[in-house]
Every structure is written in C-alpha cells, then in structure tokens.
C-alpha cells in the first residue's frame, strides 16, 4: 500500500487551484472572513465547499438542513448546488452573522432557496420534527454535536446523508495529551458514530475532517 500524503497548506492550495472555481460571492465571503481575525477559523475550507457541492449533485439531494451557518460560505455552496426547487434551512443563533450571511445570499440570488432560523439549534431541531431532509450538515457548537447528531435521525430520510465537520479537531483527537472538553467531546462522538449500526460512515480528511454518514 502506498504512503498516504499529509495535507499541508501547500497541498490544500494546490487542490483548490485544480478544482472548479468558486463563484464571485463565495470569494467575497472568504475575503470578508479574512478580515475577522481569529473568528475566521469558523469558516469551512474551500475543498469542503467543493465536496458539499459535488455530493449534492451526485446524490440528487433536494432538501438540506445546515446546523451552524456563520457568514454563509457553506450555506451558499450548498444552495448553488441545489436544483431550482431545492431548499436549504440554515440554523444559527448569532443575529449579526446571520444578517451578513443573508446579504451574501441575496447578492448571489440564492435567497429564495435559503431560509434562515436564528435561535439555538437544539430548539429549532425540535420544531422541525415534522419535516424531512435528504442531507444534514452539522458545523456548530462542538459540545452539542452528539445531540445534534441524534436529533438528526428524527428528520433525515432513509438513505440520506449526515455530514459532520471538525471531527479531526486540528489533529488533537490523536494526541493523547489533549484532554480538554472539546477534544474529549469530539473523540466521544467519533467513537459513538463508529459503533452506530444506523449508518455507514467514513471520515474524510478535508479541512478539519468531515464524517460522512449514510443513513441505512
């Protein structure tokens, strides 16, 4: 077996350069996020935008729920991939970043596909229990990840996808010296999903790591 390559920043940039191009508004969101200092870390990687776009196209996904929206890069990437009659519901509790995200959605003419709900996602998930989704993307507060994952089964279609970001947690999941609550929480989630007979799953090393689960 050949040696697996380590994804450095140079390799990540190379991947982005040779993948399909982002839209002007996606680039504008990235430029805006670059002005935010440490908060920029909440942005998904460009390679993850490409992955979300392609998985939606390949799987003929129509209805998506996003848990954690920030300034809208992942949501816009999802919306651009959806068919004209597709729908994305984006959950986030931050009113200020939601306003910014909505402004970008309008600029990209995708606002008709996207409904934003501004409140804690735990509450929103209970209120959405009568809806069904083809895909759920989880990228919010890490300490609630397991609850978001479990609640997703109430509203995901059979054969649907649950995709979870940050599951490699800057590589700290494999560092035995890291025992902070966030690292422990991500480790526990990964172990939980690995034993979950309701799904088949893989961790993909894009960005900070994504778990892709197909619901059986």
Spans of model-derived segments:
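A short alpha-helical cap/connector motif
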Residues: 1-135, 142-163, 167-216
């Amino acid at each position: 077996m050949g040696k697996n390559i380590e994804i450095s920043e140079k390799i990540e940039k190379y991947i982005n350069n040779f993948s399909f191009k982002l839209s002007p508004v996606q680039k504008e969101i990235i430029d805006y996020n670059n002005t935010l200092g440490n908060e920029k870390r909440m942005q998904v990687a460009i390679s993850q935008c490409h992955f979300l776009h392609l998985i939606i196209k390949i799987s003929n996904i129509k209805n998506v729920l996003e848990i954690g929206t920030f300034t809208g890069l992942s949501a816009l990437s999802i919306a651009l991939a959806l068919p004209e009659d597709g729908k994305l519901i984006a959950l986030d509790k931050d009113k200020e970043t939601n306003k910014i995200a909505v402004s970008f959605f309008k600029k990209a003419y995708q606002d008709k596909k996207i409904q934003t709900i501004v409140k804690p996602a735990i509450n929103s998930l209970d209120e959405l229990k009568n809806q069904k989704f083809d895909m759920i993307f989880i990228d919010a507060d890490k300490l609630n990840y397991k609850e978001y994952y479990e609640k997703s089964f109430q509203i995901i279609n059979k054969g649907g996808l649950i995709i979870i970001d940050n599951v490699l947690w800057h590589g700290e999941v494999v560092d035995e010296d890291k025992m902070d609550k966030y690292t422990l929480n991500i480790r526990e989630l990964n172990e939980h999903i690995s034993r979950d007979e309701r799904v088949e799953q893989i961790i993909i090393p894009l960005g900070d790591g994504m778990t892709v689960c197909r619901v059986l």
